[in-house]
């Protein structure tokens, strides 16, 4: 399928922001920190604790306009990190503690637990941006 453009000689696809399929706001559980979590599927594997090595697939969007800013699936490479060591944004360390391998979840993270007033211009994340992630926990070790 081709997307029409203003000039017949230029065949460039239009840029479209597509809202991710997310649970209704009421389905999310609030944590005391302000992170909100919705479990799409409970995993049956090993449970994560501080210091666990996690391998995940994720997609991240700006909460304001649903613009995707990053995806391990698009990179075709899972992301690995050690939980609770400050190697990821604080919202991830909070949300991914005590989850089991195989879990699929959605996470809403307030700016203060993401990139805060700094933002990350190279990724298209403005200052004080709330973020939304879909995360699948592939491995806990």
Explain the meaning of each model-derived region:
Residues 1-141:
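Cross-family detector of peptidyl-prolyl cis-trans isomerase
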